């Protein structure tokens, strides 16, 4: 259970970071890194 929860959190973080990079490269001025 705990391991599955950890993998789910890791996948969510990875997906979120990828989405941030994609949105950042789309020229959206509201998100700047």
Curated annotation (Swiss-Prot):
One term of GO molecular function: electron transporter, transferring electrons within cytochrome b6/f complex of photosystem II activity
Biological process annotations from GO: cytochrome complex assembly; photosynthesis
Topology in the lipid bilayer: Single-pass membrane protein
Listed transmembrane segments: 2-22
GO (cellular component) term, any one: cytochrome b6f complex
Tagged with keyword Electron transport: yes
Claim: Transmembrane helix is one of the keywords in the record: yes
Subunit structure: The 4 large subunits of the cytochrome b6-f complex are cytochrome b6, subunit IV (17 kDa polypeptide, PetD), cytochrome f and the Rieske protein, while the 4 small subunits are PetG, PetL, PetM and PetN. The complex functions as a dimer.
Protein name (database record): Cytochrome b6-f complex subunit 8
Gene: petN
């Amino acid at each position: 259970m705990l391991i599955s929860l950890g993998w789910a959190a890791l996948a969510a973080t990875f997906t979120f970071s990828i989405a941030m990079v994609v949105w950042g490269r789309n020229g959206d001025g509201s998100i700047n890194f």
